[in-house]
Amino acid sequence: ESIQEKNGGPKMIQVCDPPRVRPVRRFSAEEFCFLLRGEAGSLYRPRSEVLRMLTVGEVCGVCDAAGAPAGAVLLQPLNADTALAAALRAWAGWRGVEGGQFLTPPVLHQPDAAEPLLRAAFARAERLARGGRVLAVLECTAHSDALLPLYIRQGLALRALRPLNSLAPCFVLAAGCAARDPVPVWVPLQDRARLARLLASGYAALDSRQTAGQETLLAMYPA
């Protein structure tokens, strides 16, 4: 867009769009419950369990440019007395549980809030864990296919695809996973059966890429 200077010469200026989301901050329980309205994920039911999770954890959230909550994720101790924490302990065992943290699935009202939210939440979880394990849970839905590569970019590795506590199938991710083989096996994210078999045999997804046809492929390594 151009404006006219007083001397008659044109000057080009760049007009930038205002930021759509604000910096990440800690949310109150009320703000998180506001975001949960209409949320269909089984991990956030019943509401009494959500209130228990809010009591023992903290909420990392981001607002839109108008100040309304745009997205949030719960940070929970792995030793918490909640159904999801117990399900993770049953899968992972007790090693590293003391001090460990995990991220619940994000509740998003704006898709562009996901990446800054997950980046800040993962950094916060690592600080709280103080060397303990850091895990993340993502319910296996149509929306999770777009979110999974964002988790992997933050340094989390996909370690399991399984039901948790009789809930819907979930992706379970973990920090601090290293590959033992330099050559990956590329598996389409949509090939759930093959993906689950490789994960169950000890593989981990440490990278992802998209094909020209917008198909997401996961790089699976023995871990």
For each feature predicted by the language model, list its residue ranges.
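Short amphipathic alpha-helix that is part of the acyltransferase structural core
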Residues: 6-49, 54-64, 68-70, 182-186
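A short helix-loop-beta-strand connector motif used in the catalytic cores of GNAT acetyltransferases and
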Residues: 50-61, 65-66, 71, 76-83, ...
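Conserved acyl-donor/pantetheine-binding loop and adjacent beta-alpha core of acyl/acetyltransferases
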Residues: 68-107
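Conserved GNAT acetyl-CoA-binding A-motif
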Residues: 100, 127-142
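Conserved beta-strand-loop-alpha-helix junction that forms the acyl-donor binding cleft
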Residues: 136-148, 187-190
